Each structure stands twice: as C-alpha cells, then as structure tokens.
Amino acid sequence: MRSAFFLGVDAVAISNRSTAPVSPVALKASAGASESLPLISVNQPGTFLDSCRNNGWKIYAANAATGADPNQRSGNKTYVSASALGNPIQNHACILILGSEGEGLRWNIKKKADYDVCVEGPRMGQGRVDSLNVSVAAGLLCETFLRRPKRIGAPRDDLPDGSQARNHQEVTSGELLF
C-alpha cells in the first residue's frame, strides 16, 4: 500500500475470499498510506472485474515472465512485457490485478484480463531466479503504469531568460535531457 500510494495509485481493491485480512501490522507498515488511499473490499472479484470492464476499464493481469516472446496476441488477449507497455493509463482507466506469491492469479480471475503483463529481467533464462516477488513486481508495474510522459521540449515562451527552447524534432540521439 505504501508503494501504491507513493506512486500515485488511486485505490486498492482487496478480495475478501482469497487474501488474508489487512492486519494492524500491515496497516502500520504502510506508514499512513492506508489512511490516505481508498481500500475497496471486494466480495466477488470476478463480478467486480466484469463491472469495471463494462464501465470502460481495461484489465491487466500481472504474470511471471516465461521467457517466450511476451509481445504477442492469443485469442482476445494480448501478452505484453512491462518494457513495451508504454503508458496505458494515458489511454484508458486501468486495473492491475496481482496474484499470490506462490500461486499467482487464480485461473477464473486471470481469464478476465484484457492483457497479461510481465516484468522481464536482463537475466531471463539464466540461473534459478525466474521471477520477482509480488511486492517488487507490483512496484515496478505501478511505476510503469503511472509514469508521466517526459517533456522533451518546452514552448518557446517558457524560458524565463528569453532564450529559445528546442522542440522535440531538434533533439538528437545521444543527448542527455533532464
């Protein structure tokens, strides 16, 4: 919850059936974020997701990377790596669903997703570590979803000293922009 609040998530929905109740220890660890971030208690996650979709939301299911090409389409679902995701929240309201540490998402919930999204590391397929723990993956995915687009150039009249700003077409590769 702390990372979700810090990164700008609007609310967190928690299933009543398949998750442990939010404990006082978890609330304390959230460092106050749980008091500022709406927590939605969901009795029927499948029905909740259907209702969200009917109201225009896109649903993304976080899954462990498999090593196969993640940027593909199968049936009515698109598989995408976080690095190729872009900034989906700029285009539509989004729900990111996360599963448990060991089991991941239940099949009946996973099938509700429009997209399967994974975080791929540079060492995929090398060694025995093939995934992240859920909290780390959640933080990385939330940052990806909520990342603000970078402004490369400023309007000509934005600079206080009267100097001229370059527009984005004038920026060449290899330049470092802050």
For the regions a protein language model found, what residue spans apply to each?
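Post-transcriptional modification and biogenesis factors for structured RNAs
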Residues: 1-178
